[in-house]
Amino acid sequence: MSNQRSSLKHLNTFALPAYASNVISAGSVETLIAAWHESKAKRQPVLLLGEGSNVLFIKNFSGTVLLNRIMGITSTEDSAAWYLHVGAGENWHQLVCHSLQNNMPGLENLALIPGCVGSAPIQNIGAYGVELKQVCEYVDLLDMDKGTIQRISAEECQFGYRDSIFKHRYGNGFAIVSVGIKLMKSWTPTLGYGDLIHMDPLTVTATDIFNSVCTMRRSKLPDPMVTGNAGSFFKNPVVSAAIAEEIVHCYPNAPHYLQPDGSVKLAAGWLIDQCSLKGYQIGGAAVHQQQALVLINQSEATGQDVIHLARYIRQQVAQRFSIWLEPEVRFIADNGEVNAVEHLS
């Protein structure tokens, strides 16, 4: 569209070419509210964006992109825990580093997850056996229409696997402005995944885990500053014990993780790899050579290139395993977020 003047290429880690009518950086609640009402008066859609690390622009955006840049970290403590109040615009990995530098362990398994703190509850980010829901105490949510802030308890957030109430009830018109983190002083290491299983729980430190997680992530995940990507493109599928048993019977080395409710989580990257898709390319988009779960901007890819590649991957995995992968990445069209699964079906 001719009125779309603001490039979003530097605002999404896929580095895809996309444009918006306007981009506003908001460092305060007041700026968020003012920009929201101005866009509403113009009858333009608004997209709230953090660091753009989990979005796929499949079309140009027809309205205003509002960058949440509310900063600040404060901490208090009692005999049982440390309590951090963190602005939504803070970088997640820098928060992890800050907590460890101040001898507050508990976030180390979540090191190097891209994005900002405000995006973390939306996805209920997780890695190496730890999810945000285990450390989140509350989320402060701004209703931009009313100009009011309400505190949502962790229980009210309805956290699920890469899911929360913020993807459903509190979508358009709401902005996360801060997140409360609670880190227990009775720290115990979580060592169930990857190279962490080789560590001694009696002697390991939070810094040891942090360093190991950083090494693992850097070895298999491309740096978005070098190669455009949005991290894990698909969710790891959670299936019934019966389906998992069938797959493990045919593929004894298939990674699988029993869940508390008796279901089993499978590794989406492994499923894709079994279809021999590493390096597979459509247009400018490709499957990463080291980690099949990551789709990359190989050479001037468009959003449609990524869509076509993701659709092909889903079909190949479904053909082989009768499992339909669901995207973890959020799909953004001209008026805002759209249903990713429907778009790939």
UniProtKB/Swiss-Prot annotation:
It is an enzyme of class 1 (oxidoreductase). GO terms for molecular function: FAD binding; flavin adenine dinucleotide binding; UDP-N-acetylmuramate dehydrogenase activity. Keywords: Cell cycle, Cell division, Cell shape, Cell wall biogenesis/degradation, Cytoplasm, FAD, Flavoprotein, NADP, Oxidoreductase, Peptidoglycan synthesis. Pathway: Cell wall biogenesis; peptidoglycan biosynthesis. GO terms for cellular component: cytosol. Its EC number is 1.3.1.98. The keyword NADP applies. Its main location: cytoplasm. Its cofactor is FAD. The active site is at R162, S232, E328. One of its GO terms (biological process) is regulation of cell shape. Coiled coil: none annotated. It is found in: Cytoplasm. It catalyses: UDP-N-acetyl-alpha-D-muramate + NADP(+) = UDP-N-acetyl-3-O-(1-carboxyvinyl)-alpha-D-glucosamine + NADPH + H(+). InterPro entries: FAD-bd_PCMH, FAD-bd_PCMH-like_sf, FAD-bd_PCMH_sub1, FAD-bd_PCMH_sub2, MurB, MurB_C, MurB_C_sf, Oxid_FAD_bind_N. Residues 16-186 form the FAD-binding PCMH-type domain. It comes from the Bacteria. PANTHER family: UDP-N-ACETYLENOLPYRUVOYLGLUCOSAMINE REDUCTASE. Belongs to the MurB family. Cell wall formation. This is UDP-N-acetylenolpyruvoylglucosamine reductase. It comes from Yersinia pestis. The gene is murB.
